């Protein structure tokens, strides 16, 4: 569902990247993929479930990242740098292929 300042999401969702998405830590909504969660938050699955929760937060804190293999990108996400093993999201412009962040 699209959103902006004049078309807000319902109160249990957050407007992120002009889409109504599940906020970090929500107990109201289940996610099926990381695309269901706000930008920078990953869907975590437990015990083989087909649905999960948006509980892995990779957003920058005060413009910085704590992991030296990541850096804060223009979306304010701590993304893994080129060539790094992708244990979470890759930096904007990179994708995880064969276990590493690549252009």
UniProtKB/Swiss-Prot annotation:
GO terms for cellular component: extracellular region. Contains 8 disulfide bonds. Keywords: Disulfide bond, Ion channel impairing toxin, Neurotoxin, Secreted, Toxin. Expressed by the venom duct. Disulfide bonds: none annotated. It is found in: Secreted. Its main location: secreted. One of its GO terms (molecular function) is toxin activity. The cysteine framework is C-C-C-C-C-C-C-C-C-C-C-C-C-C-C-C. Acts as a neurotoxin by inhibiting an ion channel. This is Turripeptide OL55-like. It comes from Lophiotoma albina.
């Amino acid at each position: 569902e699209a959103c902006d300042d004049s078309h807000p999401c319902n109160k249990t969702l957050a407007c992120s990247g002009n889409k109504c998405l599940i906020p970090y830590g929500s107990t109201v909504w289940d996610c099926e993929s990381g695309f269901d969660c706000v930008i920078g938050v990953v869907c975590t699955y437990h015990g083989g479930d087909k649905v999960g929760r948006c509980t892995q937060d990779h957003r920058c804190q005060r413009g910085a990242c704590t992991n030296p293999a990541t850096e804060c990108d223009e979306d304010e996400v701590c993304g893994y740098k080129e060539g790094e093993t992708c244990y979470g999201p890759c930096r904007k412009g990179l994708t995880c292929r064969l276990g590493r962040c690549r252009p």
